[in-house]
Amino acid sequence: PEHYPIVDFILGLEKDDILSNPARKTYYKTFSSPMQRILTAYCQSGGNLLVSGSYIGSDMSNSQGNREFTEKILKYGFQGSLKDTRSGQITGLGRTLQIPRLPNEKAYAVTAPDCIVPVDSAFPVFVYQPGQYSAGIAYKGNYRVFAMGFPFESIESETDRAIVMAAILKFFGEK
């Protein structure tokens, strides 16, 4: 953390996708085994980690080791993917945000963002609307984690992105 007080790990739509190209299996994994070791060491040394992406839960739910990493280190559990609604509305941090759920000409579609729930002493920070499914968590312990089950960059409003990032940076800076 002395060199990198905050790490922003932006995953977008990245996931393990063996069906479309078997050769790329580990390259697109959200958190490969080596990356899990690096992020674990970073967190255990007191770092501040921001993680966002549509598949940060679903891509990690296929093995006990992957689930242990997300639950014990990143402090969230996977509750499912939001596939049944087309609403791109998310509430949290005193804001109502919008993400694109359908294909459009301006930004990539976030068709199935992950519902991630807090584990241990983590707490919810974002909720998908309607339905009240958890969309993001924060953890404050010997290190800090702020995780979003949707890509940060998919927040449509530039103003909302700036306000959310300012709130995250403030959370990381609190004593």
Across the structure, where does each feature detected by a protein language model lie?
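A glycine-rich, often tryptophan-bearing local segment used as a flexible ligand/cofactor-contacting loop or short
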Residues: 14-110, 120-122, 130
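Short loop/turn segments at strand-loop or loop-helix junctions that form parts
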Residues: 4-19, 53-54, 148-150
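Extracellular ligand-binding/catalytic regions of CAZymes and related secreted enzymes
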Residues: 61, 65-83, 118-123, 131-175
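Short amphipathic alpha-helices and their capping/turn segments at secondary-structure boundaries
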Residues: 1-2, 136
